[in-house]
Every structure is written in structure tokens, then in C-alpha cells.
Amino acid sequence: MLVGKQAPVFKATAVVNGEIVNDFSLQDYVDKKYVVFFFYPKDFTFVCPTELLGFQAALPEFTKRDTVVVGCSTDTEYSHWAWCQKPQCEGGISGVTYPLVADTNKTIADAFDVLAGERYVDENGKLQVKGELVAYRGLFLIDKQGIVRHQLVNDMPLGRSIDEAIRIVDALQHFEQYGEVCPLGWHPGQEAMQATHEGVAKYLSNNSERRMQNN
């Protein structure tokens, strides 16, 4: 669990707006931007392009919230680049402009604790691998101080909700600005609450009808 801790620091090669760049680091955003950092299993697969293209379509919403989006998988930068060149009608992700990090040595996925597969040393002292060392669908919201404030990890068949990622950014920023905590399903413009007995009592009283409708 990384929530409440400093996000792991790394430097890696990435593809940014169709160009290969060296020494990419999330540290460059500290004190400047919020970061939605997400992992996906593989380039040229099936659920993954729906997520990557979905994040691209929602990029203006993240930008309005002073938030950058960064993707990462264990593929090479050349695989990322080739996938970015391939038309969407052929399963590609042409049009994706945000950074795609190449975690070829698996250390970033391992540091964020989303690396699938098992590694162990056998009785002969040799490193063995069971399963494929690719990333689960992890997503991390990192604040401007570089602290992980939210994490979500899905198994590989389960795509994520970009609307929920945006909602979590909104909730964090509301808390930072107003000091109010954000209850179940909160969206901007809805009532939040003070983290006190009086605050929760007021919230529950004001929203009892809405809870009944949701049930």
C-alpha cells in the first residue's frame, strides 16, 4: 500500500507525443502538477487501448484540474512508439499524446507493487519466474508534494473508469481547498462535510432522501 507515502522515484525512457525521450521522471511534476499515473499490461492488446484512448479523450478535463496523465507498461519505448503510430481502426492508439513510460526492466511496476508473476530462487540458487512479469491495471493519484493519495489495482480483464479517476481528483482538490471530506459518490457542487460528529450528523440529515433513492 502506497497511499500516504512518497511515490517511488524513477527515471526511464518514455514516448511523449510521438517522440522518444530519455530520463523521464515524475519528479519533474513535484510542486507543479497533480499526476494520474496508471499502469497497463501490454501494448497491442485488447482492453488496454480502450483505456489509453479514453484517457486521451478526457485529457482536457484533467488539464482543467491542473493534472497530468502518465501511462506505463513493461513494453519497450519502440513498442510504445509503434503502437502510437498504428491507426485506431487497426487496434492502434494514434493520437495519444501524454507520456507512456517504458518499464523494460520491471523495476517501476515492482516499486509500485503492481507487477504480476512470481520470482523466486530455486534449490540450485537460480532465479526462477512463474507467470508473465507484466503490470496489473494500477492507478495512482499523486499530489503536488509527490505523495500518493489514491491507488486502485484491477486484475487484467477489468478495465477502469476514467470518470471515477476524475472524481477522485475533484475530491482531493475539494478537501485541500475547503478542508471538507467527500462522502460516497461525491461530485463537485454536492454537499461535503466537516470531519466531526456534528458534520456527519448534519450531512446524513440533509441527505437522507438521496440515500433512500440510491437504495
Label each PLM-derived region with a short phrase.
Residues 1-215:
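Chalcogenol-based redox active-site neighborhoods
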